[in-house]
């Protein structure tokens, strides 16, 4: 048994996308720094974020184009304005989803908050993200920033941190991250070139990564490739500064990584031999979970499954790189659907649902040994919710990983419910709710009288329920 790396403490789960922002979605800007200050003021230790990768259709952070790249939506536009790559007036002239857009605003008025005349668009709600409007505007505005960035590099007049010339900082970033950035930037440029269809529908030669086709598109799409590299340069620079600020204030960042990649991702396209694909590069088996009390058909997620035999033959090289990259981004790494490392559910890709699936043994400790070697002293949280797999408890104990409990699940059963705090064992992380739950306020607004009564009696309070539930978690 390995001793846990955690000490008793508390934190807050706050998706970056949910931070306040005038530009449609939360970013790494001022409000993120204010949130760090809030976490510190609460005497908490941790800020947990959802996966930071670029999202695909459906906008779920658990379906990403890359295990290594960052979400362009989180690049703060005000910081780009400060750097001289954007004008305030051209940023606020976009409809980011609240339905109110200034028109005919000078740059001076924009900077000083004097917006003058407004027009009403399709009235939105600033409590929610309008992903359609963010998508339609964010990439265009980042393209403007990229063009000014290129001009600044050519002129070699602008400098950033420590006086290092801008082009040199960018070149260093590209060089240091070449093992994933080159494929990612080409992949995204190709996505745009082929009208955003899945890579499985691209022209045959580039789909199969034939060397001549790779060279052809690298040359033809060189400017687009530079654009996608620039976005990652800004993402990583802004996130690194924010994380340093958090760490300097005693706050650690808990990151979240999905166990599986989506089929339409650069990781599958660039590592075709390490996934269960047929000769046409179509998934043979896909991920999901079996039928249970909540679903007669189970859940067919559709993610291509890893070919763990080939991965092991390569010393789990992709996993090592992935976890090493995650260790640079985060102080603690939460692995979603951790059970899948020990035992995974496999479904024939041509089946309509998960009823025809079966369990297969995962790599277990072999993969975890590679992960532990890759992340050094960084900590791991294992999301072990759902189907109980006896082998998981031993794996967690052997590695010192804490599992999870969810307080919102605690009051719907009897006294043996494992999510009730008095049934907790040592070395676990208790969440009020996860990204799959409603908010704590929503929980108390939407539960029936019996479940609420149980919660009130257990927490011994009715008028300060939020504070009491937080007390139980810590």
For each feature predicted by the language model, list its residue ranges.
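Alpha-amylase-like alpha-glycosidases and glucanotransferases acting on alpha-linked glucans and related
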Residues: 2-8, 15, 21, 59-232, ...
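N-terminal catalytic cores of NTP/NDP-binding nucleotidyl/phosphoryl-transfer enzymes
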Residues: 11, 15-36
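Outer-envelope exported proteins of Gram-negative bacteria
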Residues: 50, 252-254, 258, 332, ...
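Conserved, well-ordered alpha-helix/loop/beta-strand core segments that scaffold catalytic motifs
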Residues: 228-261
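Surface-exposed amphipathic alpha-helices with a cationic face
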Residues: 40, 239-247, 372, 396-397
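Catalytic domains of carbohydrate-active enzymes, especially glycoside hydrolases
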Residues: 5, 30-55, 329-330
């Amino acid at each position: 048994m390995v001793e846990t790396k955690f000490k008793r403490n508390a934190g807050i789960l706050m998706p970056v996308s949910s931070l306040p922002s005038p530009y449609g979605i939360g970013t790494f800007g001022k409000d993120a720094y204010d949130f760090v200050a809030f976490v510190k003021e609460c005497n908490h230790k941790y800020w947990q974020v959802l996966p930071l990768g670029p999202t695909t259709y459906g906008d779920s952070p658990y379906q990403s184009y890359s295990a290594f790249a960052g979400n362009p939506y989180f690049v703060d536009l005000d910081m780009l304005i400060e750097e001289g790559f954007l004008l305030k007036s051209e940023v606020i002239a976009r409809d980011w989803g609240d339905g109110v857009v200034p028109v005919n605003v000078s740059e001076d008025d924009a900077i000083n908050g004097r917006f003058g005349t407004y027009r009403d668009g399709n009235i939105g709600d600033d409590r929610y993200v309008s992903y359609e409007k963010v998508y339609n505007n964010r990439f265009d505005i980042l393209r403007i920033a990229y063009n000014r960035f290129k001009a600044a590099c050519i002129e070699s007049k602008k400098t950033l941190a420590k006086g290092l010339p801008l082009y040199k900082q960018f070149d260093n970033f590209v060089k240091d991250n070449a093992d994933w950035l080159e494929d990612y930037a080409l992949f995204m440029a190709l996505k745009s070139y082929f009208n955003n269809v899945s890579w499985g529908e691209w022209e045959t030669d580039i789909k199969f990564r034939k060397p001549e086709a790779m060279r052809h598109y690298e040359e033809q799409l060189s400017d687009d490739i530079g654009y996608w590299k620039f976005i990652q340069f800004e993402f990583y620079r802004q996130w690194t500064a924010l994380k340093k600020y958090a760490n300097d204030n005693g706050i650690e960042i808990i990151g979240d990584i999905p166990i599986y990649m989506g089929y339409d991702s650069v990781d599958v396209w660039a590592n075709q031999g390490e996934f269960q694909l047929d000769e046409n590069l179509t998934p043979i088996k896909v991920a999901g979970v079996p039928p249970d009390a909540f679903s007669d058909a189970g859940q067919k997620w559709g993610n291509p499954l890893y070919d763990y035999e080939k991965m092991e033959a390569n010393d789990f090289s992709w996993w090592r790189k992935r976890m090493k990259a995650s260790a640079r981004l985060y102080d603690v790494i939460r692995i979603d659907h951790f059970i899948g490392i020990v035992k995974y559910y496999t479904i024939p890709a041509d089946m309509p649902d998960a009823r025809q699936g079966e369990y297969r043994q995962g790599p277990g400790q072999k993969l975890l040994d590679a992960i532990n070697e890759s992340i050094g002293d960084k900590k791991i949280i294992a999301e072990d919710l759902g189907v109980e797999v006896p082998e998981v408890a031993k794996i967690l104990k052997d590695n010192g990983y804490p599992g999870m409990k969810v307080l919102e699940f605690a009051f719907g059963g009897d006294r043996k419910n494992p999510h009730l705090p008095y049934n907790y064992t040592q070395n676990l992380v208790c969440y009020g709710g996860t990204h799959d739950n409603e908010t704590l306020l929503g929980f108390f607004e939407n539960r029936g009288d019996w479940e609420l009564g149980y919660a009130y009696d257990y927490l011994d309070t009715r008028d300060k329920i939020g504070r009491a539930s937080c007390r139980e978690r810590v």
